[in-house]
A protein has these predicted regions:
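Glycine-biased, small-residue-rich flexible motifs in mid-sequence functional cores and linkers
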Residues: 71-191
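Short, positively charged patches
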Residues: 1-128
Length: 191
């Protein structure tokens, strides 16, 4: 996933063909040409950028920052996510992902400018689930996402915050304490 020009659909094709990330990563052009639906240009781009990736340095960087990861071949990769059409090849996370019941989740999606009505009703719904093993899953933007995670924590629920920005910076910065609370015992932040 360190090669920006390569998307998860490409990685999924490699994984499906080779059955192993390491074999896929070390493939040559002739092997890549055998993969149905994979253009020669995409294969050549992969080889060009692959040779610039320092796997050991990337791994050390992830590890020293306290970030964990799962790949598609990991038995702990969430089953529901693995079964979507184009699952992420790698999930990076901080926190206690496996304390969350990934079989019982409540997904919350809503506006960054949520109305008072939406905020209040979401709090009521989540408080009704308090002290159960349901895990709340939402983005970590402002608005309804923040309400969902805050309500989950207030009601002793595990929660998973999904971010698109990676772990280099927190967005919005007003959610810094929320990120830390999730990572430090109330679930996980996933990128």
């Amino acid at each position: 996933s360190s090669i920006e020009q390569i998307d998860s659909k490409f990685i999924q094709r490699l994984f499906n063909y080779f059955g192993n990330i390491e074999l896929a990563f070390n493939a040559d052009l002739n092997e890549l040409k055998n993969i149905e639906g994979l253009s020669v240009k995409k294969a050549e781009n992969f080889l060009k950028y692959r040779d610039k990736v320092d796997i050991d340095r990337t791994y050390t960087n992830v590890e020293t920052r306290g970030v964990n990861f799962l790949t598609l071949e990991d038995e702990n990769y969430p089953k529901m996510l693995k079964n979507i059409e184009n699952p992420p090849a790698v999930l990076y996370y901080k926190g206690k992902l496996f304390e969350c019941n990934l079989e019982k989740t409540l997904a919350v999606v809503g506006s960054r400018k949520a109305s008072t009505y939406a905020r209040d009703n979401l709090k009521k719904i989540i408080s009704g689930l308090g002290n159960t093993d349901i895990c709340v899953v939402s983005g970590l933007a402002s608005g309804i996402d923040t309400v969902a995670h805050t309500a989950a924590i207030e009601n002793n629920l595990q929660t998973i915050g999904v971010i698109a920005s990676g772990f280099d910076y927190i967005y919005p910065t007003s959610n810094k304490t929320l990120y830390q609370n999730i990572e430090n015992g109330y679930g996980a932040v996933v990128s």
